[in-house]
Each structure stands twice: as structure tokens, then as C-alpha cells.
Amino acid sequence: MSKNFKRVGAVAVAAAMSLSIMATTSINAASSPANKVYQDRFESMYSKIKDPANGYFSEQGIPYHSIETLMVEAPDYGHVTTSEAMSYYMWLEAMHGRFSGDFTGFDKSWSVTEQYLIPTEKDQPNTSMSRYDANKPATYAPEFQDPSKYPSPLDTSQPVGRDPINSQLTSAYGTSMLYGMHWILDVDNWYGFGARADGTSKPSYINTFQRGEQESTWETIPQPCWDEHKFGGQYGFLDLFTKDTGTPAKQFKYTNAPDADARAVQATYWADQWAKEQGKSVSTSVGKATKMGDYLRYSFFDKYFRKIGQPSQAGTGYDAAHYLLSWYYAWGGGIDSTWSWIIGSSHNHFGYQNPFAAWVLSTDANFKPKSSNGASDWAKSLDRQLEFYQWLQSAEGAIAGGATNSWNGRYEAVPSGTSTFYGMGYVENPVYADPGSNTWFGMQVWSMQRVAELYYKTGDARAKKLLDKWAKWINGEIKFNADGTFQIPSTIDWEGQPDTWNPTQGYTGNANLHVKVVNYGTDLGCASSLANTLTYYAAKSGDETSRQNAQKLLDAMWNNYSDSKGISTVEQRGDYHRFLDQEVFVPAGWTGKMPNGDVIKSGVKFIDIRSKYKQDPEWQTMVAALQAGQVPTQRLHRFWAQSEFAVANGVYAILFPDQGPEKLLGDVNGDETVDAIDLAILKKYLLNSSTTINTANADMNSDNAIDAIDYALLKKALLSIQ
């Protein structure tokens, strides 16, 4: 059959139906206005996410990382949460406000964040934080590549620069406490550390990653943020990570994930815009977001405030600022003694950048921070971030990893021949190598979505050029299958490096930097982020391929992956053998206990210090699969992915109010062609209704039922054109 049947044959299909139904004259007739279709999908997802029976939220109103408890990726348990999830909660509620006119849910998301994810004065006593010395922000401790090299010795002889923004912040807000989200929270107190070492209260501030780029989640040792030496070993968990010359003091410590705080600002901007359109106000939440953005500037600075591009020297102020959203900033201090510290991060990943948030915090009068340099610092960051993307854009269009001001985490000399960005060396996979931090496709869509929003709002020429090339690359990598499903890149790999950045010259094309798609998959969260990105880009640029692909991804997910709790797909977890066989490094001679009595000692496995997993409802199924030599499978409902899909539908509804789902009668499998395969699939469906089909296209007589009449009409239509 001719491939032209996609267009010509479809007309014949419609004509052949004239005996029993009214002729269809358009093969792409919209079924209903898109604002209604995609808005309804958003509202359906919102209802499922907020339904208490589905289990997305704790009794305190905190979103879990996932509904499922047996779950290891960046978090090591499904019922922890992250600042990432909290920022998506804000975004979800902002969109709900846009459609419902009710922004109380959005304000509540900020209240929950402030109560549970931003350490209060009880969690970071101002008596300790006020003793912070901006001229001596922290004591240097080298980083190592492998966990077996830890604990790391504190070294007071190494240069540490001056913190130039602390006085700005204390002057603006009248406190020495920091205002940012800690990145991970044990929502149900599963580990048993409790709040401030009480062992029982929930939620509980915890941490995991501490020991270099090769420390995967599977190799971490969970620890409390408030360490009174009550759990763990003689000195709690502190001497697993740093080696002090004296007795480790009882202390608190928190780590911020800058991309999440920036996403919170991003979501709050849209809530503010949409509220104003309806005569409403979210000004209290705007004030919180603006304050958070002010403190987020700590991520602009080298870890120990050393000079950018000259890291052997202590910085004297802003010469220690790279103006990028680095991997973290962190702070801590004494529990029963008055001292404190603050560090930035030397490592910068393109995936954490958010030029949209930088634009908001530097240009919107309502979002300009209170501090003296807040808005101007964010203005510099906006330009520096866009330069960073330009420097890292591969020949194909995908964005490569990042740069560090501290080679190997020890301020070693950047190897000869290494490309640099303002003196910082190119790193293919910044911060983490197991797995490589820029091998996950999700970084592409998370980060470029923010560039797309910036382009949509401002028309920035730099953002447009980045997106033009990136969109061309990714649109060529999306695969729509005959059965209505799809595949997008899952793992990507890199070859070569970018050209050394010259601000005057700008983007060179990076002929020696290449991306390769290693494998494809159906990550619904990433696909939703991709649809969101392409929607914003298409709305501003008019690129029809991007609009169509965004719509097709949204439709494919809705039609093929919806379930009673949201969307999901069966995932193969080839890494789950590490539950049983992954050793967690503990120095010889070090012993301690987890709150439940699990012994921490040399030779322990992941499961040995997380024995409560053996009580999980999915545990026996997973172990049985492993023992049978099979790869365990799961259906997972990650909060961020569910929210991303909901928001992406909302974005499409807003930006394309007149574009509904395309309808091609007879295209039962959704491959945009009507042929004998569709007839066969429809027959299979009639025999077994679990078969996946495009019901709108299969309903040949538009009676809202798929039955033998539709089969007969499709068969008649196909025969008439042969």
C-alpha cells in the first residue's frame, strides 16, 4: 500500500463510511478546543495526586519522593522527600491556581516548605550561626574520588577566602540563619534519627552523599543532620567523613540543592503572574521565594571562596564567584558550642542552571532581593549561565557536562589541554561518576525547559540559538512506535570537549564535542519535561515540529500510560542486585549502630544497615526475581514525574488554546497511517480489550463505543481504496 495513504487514503476512509454515517471531510479535525482537553487532563492528574487514597503525601502534607517505598535512585527510600519534590509541589499548585482561581494550595506548599524543609532556629540556632566569621568561612578538607579514601583530614593550613555576601544578608534580614531548603528529609522517620536526635519525631533531617564522585547511593551511609553522637559510633557519624585533630564536636549541618530552590522561584513567578491576571495575590509567597533567591547566591561561590581560575589563592570577595548555580551550598555549626561555617561549591553542572530564575530575580520588581547586591548579582548570573550553555553545546546540539574550579576536589592543576571556562576546567560528568551525572537524559530536558521559558518571555537571542540547535537534535531522536508508545533518549554519552571559552568570540560550534545516544527508554517524567520544553519553544518560535512532538508525547502518555494513580510504566531495575551485594565502605576498626540496631562495621552491605527494607511489601518479590536470575521490575509513581506530566499538560493548554489532539479516523495504532495493521489491531482489541489502541481514531462512527461496527467500517474503507 502506498505511503501516501496517510493523507490521500484517509479521505477515502471517510468517504467509504457515507453509507452509515455522515462523511468526515477533514482527516485532522480537532475533537475539542485544546485548552479544555489538556486542562481537563491537568485537572485529572491533579485530583489523582491530591487524592489521599493514592498516598502521594504524608499526614503533614509533605509529598513523598514516590508512592512506593522500595525505591533507590538519588534518594535511598521512597518515603523520603527532596527539595526537588517540594519545588514540583509548588509548580503543581501554581498551575492549579491558574485554572481554578484558587491559590490557597500554592501558599500552603510554601508553608509546608518553610515548616519542614527550611531549617528553623531550633535546627540551626542563631546563637551558633551568629558566630560565623566571614573572613574564615570554613576549614578546608580535600575531596577524594573513592569512599575508601575517607575520612578526609581537616587542614587549617590551606587558604580559604572571604565571604562577601554574609554581611549583606544579615543586614537585610536581621539574622545569621540561612534561608534555603535542605535537600533530603526522612518524612516518616524511617531511619529513626528523629528530630534533633530525639529518635521519634517526624519528619527528620538526614543526609547521605559525603564521600566523593564514586560514592553511588548504594554506597552511602545515612546520617542525621543533627549529630549529638547519640547514634552511630563514639562520635556519631562525623568521623566517617572528616578527620579532626581533636574530638569531633556535636554539630548540625545542612546541604542545599540549588536547582530545586531556583525551581521554587520559577514556580512562584508563574503563580504570581497567574494570580495577578485574576485579581488575586500570592505576595507572601513571593516574599519567601525572593528571600530564598537571595541566599541562593551562596551557590555562586567556590567551595572555600578561592579565586575563580586561580584556585591556589584565597579569594578576597567576588573574585571567588563563578556566578553559576553550582552543585550545592552547605552550612552548619555547633550544638552546644557557638561556632558555624558556610561553603559554596567549586563544581558546576549545566543541568542545575536556571537562567529563567536569574532573569526573574534580576528584573522583576516584586522578586528583586532585599540585599544590596542581590539583583545585580543575579543579573551577572543570567549572562554567565547563558555563556555556560553556549560553551557546552555540542556539535549536534545537546549540552555537555560542566566545569570545576577545584580539579579532583583538591584544587589540583587543570591538566594541560583541558578546555576551560573562565579558567575552570571542563568536566564530562561533574560531581558524580556512578553513574555519570551527565549520562542521564533528564538533565537535558530539566535544564533546557528553563532556557525555553526565558526565550518565551524575553525572546533572548542567545536562548533562541541554543534552543534552535537543541530542538533540532532532540526532535530527531524521538521515536513514535506503531502501537502508540514512544521512546526518547535514556542514556547518553560524550566524546571530546568544547573549545575553550572566549566571551568575545562566543559559540564556536564545538566541532570536537559530540553526543551519542546509548539507549532509548520511556521515562515518563523526562518525556513530560521534554514536552514542556518543546511547548514553550514552539509557542515562541512557531516551530511546528516541536509543537507536534510535544502534543504527540502528551497524547501518547495519556492514552497509553494512565492508571488510577497517575501515569506509570513497567521499569526494569537492573541495579537492584546492589541491595544484596553492594558493600558500603566503613574504615577498619570503626563500629557503630543505626537507630534500629543495625551494626555499621567494615564489610557491611547496603541492606545490612537498612534491614527495615526486609519488611517492605515488595521485598520478597524483588528478592525472588534476583534469586531466579531475573531483573526486578516495578511500577513507580515519582511525585516529580506525576507533577511534571500534569504541569506539561497545563502549559500546552495555555500556550496552544486552539490545538486539540489530532484525530485520524482508522489510525488505530496511532502511527499516523491507516492500513491493514490498524484493522488487525482493532480485531485484536475486540477479542481482548487490554490491547492498546487510539480509541478516538478507532471510533469510526463516533458513537463513543468501539465494537464490530467500527471494524466493519474500517474494513470497508480499506477495501474501497485498494
From Swiss-Prot:
Similarity section: Belongs to the glycosyl hydrolase 48 (cellulase L) family.
Job of this protein: Probable endoglucanase involved in the degradation of cellulose or related beta-glucans.
Upper taxonomic lineage: Bacteria, Bacillati, Bacillota, Clostridia, Eubacteriales
Keywords of this entry: Carbohydrate metabolism, Cellulose degradation, Glycosidase, Hydrolase, Polysaccharide degradation, Signal
GO BP terms: cellulose catabolic process
EC number: 3.2.1.4
Position of the signal peptide: 1-29
Reactions this protein catalyses: Endohydrolysis of (1->4)-beta-D-glucosidic linkages in cellulose, lichenin and cereal beta-D-glucans
Identification of the protein by name: Endoglucanase F
InterPro entries per the UniProt record, alphabetical: 6-hairpin_glycosidase_sf, 6hp_glycosidase-like_sf, Dockerin_1_rpt, Dockerin_dom, Dockerin_dom_sf, Endo-1-4-beta-glucanase_dom2, Endoglucanase_F_dom3, Glyco_hydro_48F
Location of region: Disordered: 142-165
Top-level division of the source organism's lineage: Bacteria
